[in-house]
Amino acid sequence: MSNQHTLLTSNLLPVGSNISTWWNFGSMLLTCLIMQILTGFFLAIHYTANINLAFSSVIHITRDVPYGWIMQNLHAIGASMFFICIYIHIARGLYYGLYLNKEVWLSGTTLLITLMATAFFGYVLPWGQMSFWAATVITNLLTAIPHLGTVLTTWLWGGFSINDPTLTRFFALHFILPFAIISLSSIHIILLHNEGSNNPLGTNSDIDKIPFHPYHSYKDMLMITIMVTLLFIILSFLPNLLNDPENFSKANPLITPQHIKPEWYFLFAYGILRSIPNKLGGTMALTMSIMILMTTPFTHTSHTRSMIFRPLSQTMFWTLIVTFIMITWTATKPVEPPFITISQTTTVFYFSFFIMTPLLGWTENKIMMMKN
């Protein structure tokens, strides 16, 4: 056995033999991150962060640069794949009680916030119609902050409206934040290696562990291969599946799109924002839709870690999944009845998961005690 192989295998923790496919999404996320950084680097070489040239430079990349269309589409579709994997990764954590490993969960939530900021800045860079107006709407939310809001917005914009300085700083932030994501990912993985992975049963894995390599590493490779295959199928046959048609027009501050919306992976948060008629209230709800994930390690009441043996909590979990899909769907629709009512109802359901789950955990404990 080579020295390199010994070094690799000696640093890989043994893992519980019963972990399922849901445990493969961490390695898939790492693959997405590497792919995004590589494609992003090649795109940055040809991109021009200027409001008069940005849109043309993206067209130049797709038309004139050799394999530029592959790089551009890989980067755009790869971002969607990144968010699909991260949402499944979070759902797995909620279902199997992985949030009880507090340090790993809190570092992961910080990673999610950084990732969302990076994706938002990236969406603005092509300087299409939807890029411009989505940036205007979202950055304008800062004005809801009492006393400091207007000053913060002007500081972020680099002027009194979204203009050339805004695009320049958004490009700088979009370029630098992935390095912060690499650092946070390293911290996330190091913290995970303190205790090691949990398993679907939520029990201690020490009695039944197997080497990570080759058993789980090959399993990871299978899922990564499936993900990359799916990515290239979309890239080859449906490259504009996840794009907004409005973004094929250059940004025009004088023409407002009929329906302003961000990328699909932000629609659940945008739907929560729109469901509240008050600007400050909507901004707070938008922030809380992500930040509330940080409360889960401190509100767990059940004696059982995983939801696998808790039918009441399972019902709440699947209600949350359906709610997430419903909010995403309603956020694509105009602000008019019945979508306003649906949006408000689903927002209540979304937040009720984080309130009801601790109460259900307490109820389940009582039922178990009665049976004993």
UniProtKB/Swiss-Prot annotation:
Family matches, as PROSITE patterns: CYTB_CTER, CYTB_NTER
Record GO cellular component, one term: respiratory chain complex III
Membrane-spanning residues: 25-45, 69-90, 105-125, 170-190, 218-238, 280-300, 312-332, 339-358
Membrane topology of this protein: Multi-pass membrane protein
GO biological process: mitochondrial electron transport, ubiquinol to cytochrome c
GO MF term set: metal ion binding; ubiquinol-cytochrome-c reductase activity
Cofactor requirement: heme b
Subunit-structure text: The cytochrome bc1 complex contains 3 respiratory subunits (MT-CYB, CYC1 and UQCRFS1), 2 core proteins (UQCRC1 and UQCRC2) and probably 6 low-molecular weight proteins.
Similarity section: Belongs to the cytochrome b family.
The protein, known as: Cytochrome b
Organism: Aspidelaps scutatus
